[in-house]
Curated annotation (Swiss-Prot):
NCBIfam families: rplB_bact
PANTHER family linked to this entry: LARGE RIBOSOMAL SUBUNIT PROTEIN UL2M, RIBOSOMAL PROTEIN L2
Subunit structure: Part of the 50S ribosomal subunit. Forms a bridge to the 30S subunit in the 70S ribosome.
Entry's transmembrane regions: none
Gene: rplB
InterPro entries per the UniProt record, alphabetical: NA-bd_OB-fold, Rib_uL2_dom2, Ribosomal_uL2, Ribosomal_uL2_bac/org-type, Ribosomal_uL2_C, Ribosomal_uL2_CS, Ribosomal_uL2_dom3, Ribosomal_uL2_RNA-bd_dom
Keywords per UniProt: Ribonucleoprotein, Ribosomal protein, RNA-binding, rRNA-binding
Function (record text): One of the primary rRNA binding proteins. Required for association of the 30S and 50S subunits to form the 70S ribosome, for tRNA binding and peptide bond formation. It has been suggested to have peptidyltransferase activity; this is somewhat controversial. Makes several contacts with the 16S rRNA in the 70S ribosome.
Protein name as annotated: Large ribosomal subunit protein uL2
GO BP annotation list: cytoplasmic translation; translation
Amino acid sequence: MAIRKYKPTTPGRRGASVADFVEVTRSTPEKSLVRPLHSKGGRNNAGRITVRHQGGGHKRAYRIVDFRRHDKDGVPAKVAHIEYDPNRSARIALLHYADGEKRYILAPRNLQQGDRVENGPGADIKPGNNLALRNIPVGTTIHAIELRPGGGAKFARSAGASVQLLAKEGAYAHLRMPSGEIRLVNVRCRATIGEVGNAEQSNINWGKAGRKRWLGVRPTVRGVVMNPVDHPHGGGEGRTSGGRHPVSPWGKPTGRTRSNKKASNKYIVRRRTKNKKR
């Protein structure tokens, strides 16, 4: 993809940019793979806000994406279309399997309409193919990685994300995550070759607040401009710095949320890099 910039015809257009969608080959999704999606506006079943800054936005339909693929080992597929998905930053690819079934997968970089995709231990090492980590050579760039065997892809699913397979020792593989963290993952877990496409997504300049509202993102108000009743940083005469280390509206310190007693800490070889530029 590429980024298309607008001329400054209005204040909202000044500096704004959009994706050119040149890789998208079809505008309507596969009807059998679409389900209704009801907007919650950040509310739970009691009607209380549990996730702030959510609400509104354009109505969406959910595309069912296959994050497992293990039941299609040995069945070749052809890429029928590359499509836009409003529910994620990556594009999705519609596969037509040789047995007649249709499924969506995340579209890797350089995957094109008409390409052949395979799953299982006999698959070639090329973008879009899905294999177990034990069958992938060291140094390969991968994405859509399972955390537990058969559990479905959990890591590296957003646009431009990729993980590097550093080593394999016994039952575990060493993976370098996009954050810089090095983590152990069982070699029976599956991953897809290549990196997720649409990497330029992070370079889009939204231009105006309204475009974020179309996506269902509501404003984020700083605590220092609130009243004391609303936030620990609120109040004071004139502009203030908050007077303390940053905290949440409920007084919890920001950052450093991972517990030292978390059971999965033993699978982290090296913690993620601090202040990593994104």
